[in-house]
Amino acid sequence: MMFFKMQGLGNDYVYIDCINGKEPIDIKNLTNRLSNRHFGVGSDGLILLCKSKVADLKMRMFNSDGSEAQMCGNGIRCAAKLAYELGLICEEITTIETLSGIKTLKLNIVNGKVKTVEVDMGAPILEATKIPVSSSAKIEDKKVKAEVKVKNKKIELTCVSMGNPHAVTFVNDIKNFKVAEYGPILENADIFPEKANIEFVEVVDKNNIKMRVWERGSGETLACGTGACSSVVASSLNGYTDRKVNVQLLGGNLEIEWKPNNHVHMTGPAVTVFKGEWIDE
């Protein structure tokens, strides 16, 4: 089985072309094995490029634990790059179907290769039941607020969905914050019926934030596109930043803009690392 290893700011996935080939049968098991960084290819998960009846193509995304996710911002940029360079799509503007809806993408092409991709991520979801977060959450001036107690410390969260659930908390020293300690507790908190991706954000100024992320089903990763979008929405709603923000992640920077039409746009790189053949012994 041929595959491609790709990454967006270090958020890396294994990609399989299921338009010219067949979809794997036991996807969860395959994802577990491919994602293993010692005994497999090594990745944050698996992404399948599939045929779509409503868009140019369909993206199915699986976390490293085999669970299927609605959307991945870094993953969809790489999916668009791969589709273009394989000849599955031919235009600079394309559409990709995901479990969180159809996304429109603009490809920046240099010498026949896709360098960066701008994604219209759609409008943020700011209704508690649709994020989803339990009824214990409070609504404060369009913000969905929640509190989780971790080791006798109350962690305040601003909850947002970009097609998948996110909870953003603001910290003073992101570099030394114990993400691996707090992340899994917050991810699995009872207030999140579908669990949640957790963003830890340090505000630098009105146009810059630093972010680390604990991804649902994957743990801490170097970057998360939907997380960056959610963090900018939360930062803006809380009055910490403007609506156009440079997000500094462990793997690099993303440009996020919450447009006047309420849609969030994300621009960032997409890189092919290598292609190979998975030998299933």
Task: Give the predicted meaning of each segment.
Residues 1-22, 119, 137-160:
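N-terminal, positively charged, Ser/Thr/Ala/Gly-biased leader segments
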